[in-house]
């Protein structure tokens, strides 16, 4: 049987535990936070070394912005007012599943949020163009590289998925994508939430 801890030993352990971040991801017990994968170079280092003169954006702030940009335009704008550099910040949800606020709004079919983000300088991509019904842009991208028909956006969502969630405004894009590669499309779970409900008169 182990000897009982002295008061001094107990106090030392308690103080040390207070300095260790909780594995529960904060007081609300939201689960463990992100963990960076282990890595060691097995190739020569690049000849250029970053100076890191400016601090990186806070990861929690980036996470919150990207999440709000999926469905809450007011909060997205509020966070952009607080930190304009969030507009093109990307969150790695794990294993290289990168997502920006624009990517989140796009795969949710939220044209209203996409328009806000574009006004703030978000970098439009092929997935956003597909959702917005920008047929010429999608055609140009696929002409540049036909294999982009199989490209995956945030969470693995395809170009077809983005065109589908765009609804009627992107039917032409979806028809074009289907003419290149016919997919058996399942009902899009985000289509019903693509636009906010209109207030009752």
Where are these regions (language model features)?
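Ankyrin-repeat C-terminal turn/loop position
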Residues: 84-85, 121-122, 146-147, 181-183
């Amino acid at each position: 049987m182990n000897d009982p801890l002295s008061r001094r030993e107990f106090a030392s352990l308690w103080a040390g535990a207070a300095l260790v971040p909780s594995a529960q991801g904060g007081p609300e017990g939201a689960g463990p936070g992100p963990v960076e994968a282990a890595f060691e170079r097995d190739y020569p280092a690049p000849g250029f070394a970053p100076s890191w003169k400016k601090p990186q954006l806070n990861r929690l702030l980036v996470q919150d912005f990207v999440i709000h940009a999926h469905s809450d335009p007011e909060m997205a704008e509020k966070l952009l007012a607080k930190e304009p550099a969030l507009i093109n910040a990307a969150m790695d949800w794990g294993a290289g599943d990168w997502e920006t606020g624009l990517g989140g709004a796009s795969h949710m079919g939220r044209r209203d949020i996409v328009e806000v983000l574009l006004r703030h300088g978000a970098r439009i991509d092929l997935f956003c163009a597909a959702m917005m019904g920008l047929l010429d842009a999608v055609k140009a991208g696929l002409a540049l590289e036909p294999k982009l028909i199989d490209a995956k956006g945030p969470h693995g969502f395809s170009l077809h998925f983005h065109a589908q969630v765009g609804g009627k405004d992107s039917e032409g894009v979806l028809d074009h994508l289907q003419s290149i590669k016919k997919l058996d499309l399942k009902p899009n779970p985000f289509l019903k939430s693509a636009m906010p409900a209109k207030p009752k008169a």
